């Protein structure tokens, strides 16, 4: 066994992991859009945001503290009261910090790579193929869970409908740039081509 493998095994043992790797799927049930303080309406489209960027909120939603690796998930809740289909492109969303630095979202697939269970390390703990398969199954559940909660790449907001999705940002340990940042969310009316931008300011420290 090489030094890296030994180190991984010792780490897993040290934090109390056993052969039974698992991922618990948590529900995500948004509140009525009026309940969110962080919201804005433009051209009959309302978008609210809730940063899930504390240990407690992240674990309650994703079963894992995503902030530990510097990720800040933000829940978007949307309501389209216009008569048109509205296009929201996830890659167009920007998080702008107090110094004007702009960050784009990261995909759940990139994030999952940092959190997935090390299948070989579980097997090396002495439980063989059964532990390997357990970790593999947990990784599949985690991938399905986090990707299903993620805002789709091109979200069509239908007239008189509500929808929601999570946008993930990688900000680094401690999420230093999240307080006093702003979310810029471009929208496009598909019938007219008219464009609007919703700006949501995340004031003060990340909400507890």
Label for each model-derived stretch:
Residues 20-208:
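Conserved functional micro-motifs across diverse proteins
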Residues 9-18:
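Bacterial N-terminal signal peptides
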Residues 1-10:
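Bacterial N-terminal signal peptides that target proteins for export
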